[in-house]
Curated annotation (Swiss-Prot):
The keyword Magnesium does not apply. The gene is pgi. This is Glucose-6-phosphate isomerase. It is found in: Cytoplasm. InterPro entries: G6P_Isomerase, Phosphoglucose_isomerase_CS, SIS_dom_sf, SIS_PGI_1, SIS_PGI_2. Keywords: Cytoplasm, Gluconeogenesis, Glycolysis, Isomerase. The active site is at E281, H310, K422. Its main location: cytoplasm.
């Protein structure tokens, strides 16, 4: 079954101040042009090259020997792997025995240089049965170079050959990591040159860890393929990605500068984190394609249902009406728990109901309350968390991001706003060729 998108609560008369047919007509031609551009100049991420799967599967006989895979990556290299792991494996996967995992690997993702995070992962692994997947497209990402150095040092301290416990995923031609592969003989996978990190989850960047923990990567690609095909339809009513872009573009022009994605499943929360990077880094731009200052973008916010009904929904219902809210809903959970009869009349309404019934009722109630308060919202329904459905989700939102970039007349595939911070970091850490002097603040406000 495909994902189902319900955009009804974004439109008049379902909410006051919602989108109208006239609003849609005003940008329909531009959206159609965005779709045609996507078809005629299909981005590499949407081509789903078969070699991506084949290159990963060529390592399967080697990978199956490891009890644990530790991904060392940040940004898209980390978030894509986390999204796959949490959405398509049980939440307690890494606590299961190898037998309970049917021989597949545990997967940990170190996506930060927080020493507590790195230590907590190292404390839980046996280097002798661990593979470190070092991922950096540039081959020089400071955070990944640091964690690579630590992991290599540990392997060498155990008397292990790093080449037998490390897999490097990087650019096919350039960068420090590719140089390492050529000089020292590490096994490697390629990050496609035309695919940016935040669009790379369906490439070897994400596929390796997915295969290692038993996720059907062919089914993942099949879902994405079908979604990309629908994303090439010019009829907006048959194209979920185009409708996502159209509605969010119109609402951005109406002052809705925040995009909330609220997942009603703990397993989907890293899908939301993945979306946050995709939407923020792709669309938050100072300049348009003409070089004019526009300072555009829509701030993505993460929420978890029902948890955040008790922290954020008050604001969403009665605070500034500056948000478009997307619900992620799962109809069928992998496991169920029935609430028992307690004998108390006050709790009888819960007796013999499934926990999932309560969770889905809370999603419906939250959605309806927002509609009553004229807060625009939409829903994406998964019949279950399967590789096919998750592949669709990735593809639809990647296509929607490309369409949104076209509508905003910006480049959704670069990220110039992150470069200065990187350069300053390199300078502070003493990297050759980088200098930066932090200026003394003329006014200081410091409280201890």
């Amino acid at each position: 079954m495909s994902l189902k998108f319900d955009f009804s609560n974004l439109f008049e008369p379902n909410i006051s101040g919602g989108l109208t047919d006239e609003d849609v007509k005003s940008v329909e031609e531009k959206v159609t042009s965005a779709v045609r551009n996507f078809v005629e100049n299909t981005p590499d991420f949407a081509k789903l090259d078969r070699s991506w799967i084949d290159s990963v599967k060529s390592l399967e006989d080697w990978i199956i020997n490891f009890d644990t895979v530790v991904v060392l990556g940040i940004g898209g290299s980390g978030l894509g792997n986390l999204a796959l792991h949490y959405s398509l494996r049980p939440l307690n996967w890494n606590e299961m025995t190898r037998e309970e995992r049917n021989g597949y690997a545990r997967v940990f993702v170190v996506d930060n240089v927080d020493p507590d995070l790195m230590s907590s992962v190292l404390d839980r692994i046996d280097p002798k049965t661990t593979l470190f997947n070092v991922i950096s497209k540039s081959g020089s990402t400071a955070e990944v170079m640091a964690t690579y150095s630590i992991a290599r040092g540990i392997l060498e301290a155990y008397g292990l050959d790093p080449r037998e416990h490390m897999l490097i995923t990087t650019d096919p031609e350039k960068g420090f990591l590719r140089k390492l592969v050529k000089e020292e003989g590490f096994r490697s996978l390629e990050v496609p040159p035309g695919v940016g990190g935040r669009f790379s989850v369906l490439t070897p960047v994400g596929l390796l860890s997915a295969m290692a923990e038993g996720i059907d990567i062919d089914e993942l690609h099949e879902g994405a393929k079908d979604a990309f095909e629908k994303s090439m339809k010019e009829n907006i009513l048959e194209n979920p990605a185009a409708m996502i872009a159209l509605t969010h573009y119109l609402y951005l022009n109406k002052g809705k500068s925040i995009s909330v994605m609220m997942a009603y499943s703990n397993r989907m929360i890293y899908l939301v984190d993945w979306y946050r990077q995709l939407w923020a880094e792709s669309l938050g731009k100072r300049y348009n394609l003409k070089g004019e200052e526009v300072f555009t973008g829509q701030t993505p916010v993460k929420a978890l249902g029902a948890t955040d009904q008790h922290s954020q929904i008050q604001l969403y219902n009665e605070g500034p009406n500056d948000k478009v809210i997307t619900f992620l809903r799962v109809e069928n959970f992998d496991r169920e728990i029935v609430i028992p009869e307690t004998g108390r009349a006050e709790l009888s309404y819960l007796a013999r109901k499934k926990l999932s019934e309560l969770l889905l009722a809370e999603q419906t109630g939250t959605e309806e309350a927002l509609r009553e308060n004229n807060r625009p919202n939409m829903r994406v329904t998964f019949d279950g968390l399967t590789p096919y459905n998750v592949g669709q989700f990735f593809a639809y939102y990647e296509a929607a991001t490309a369409f949104m970039g076209y509508l905003l007349e910006i480049n959704p595939f670069d990220q110039p706003g992150v470069e200065l911070g990187k350069k300053i970091t390199f300078a502070l850490m003493g990297r050759e060729g980088y200098t930066y002097e932090i200026k003394e603040r003329s006014k200081k406000v410091i409280i201890e």
